[in-house]
Amino acid sequence: MKKVLHIYICGCIFFRQPRLTRLPKKYGGNYAVRIVKGTVNIYGGYFHSSNNSTTKEGTCEVIYLESAWAASSKCVLNVYGGVFETDGDASYLINCKDNYRSKCTVKIMGGIFVGFNPADNTAEGANTNFLAEGYVSKEITYNGKQAWEVTKAE
C-alpha cells in the first residue's frame, strides 16, 4: 500500500520541528520540509527556512528531497499552492540530493516562490524546470521581493 502525506495548512506557519528539520551543523541543512521517502502533496501554507544552512555554499533549501539509499526509496513532491521563502540564497529553494536525484520527482502546479523561478533555475543543473506540464510561472512581487507565481497555462 502506497503511503501519501497530505499537508493542509491555513494561514502562515513556520515548520520548526527540530527532530525532522534540523541536522547537526556538520551535515548542513535547515529545511522547512525534508522528504526521505514517499509522496508529499502541499496544498497551501507558508514554508520558510532561515539563513544558517551550510549546504551548497550557504544556500537555504526550503524543501529538500533526500531519497534514502534503499533501492525502493523514492521521493515525490507535488505542490498545488503555498508560499515558499528563505532568508538566504534561494538558488536551491527546492533541491534534490545529488546522489539520489534520479529517485526524486518534483511537480509544481501552484504557489509563490520568493527569489526562485521553478520553471527555470539551477537547482538540478542549468535550466531546471519543476513545473508540471500545462503550467507556467510569471514574475511578480511578493512583500517587495522578486517572486514567481505558478498557475495553469491559459
Roles of regions detected by a PLM:
Residues 1-88, 95-116, 124-153:
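Surface-exposed loop/turn motifs in large extracellular/passenger domains
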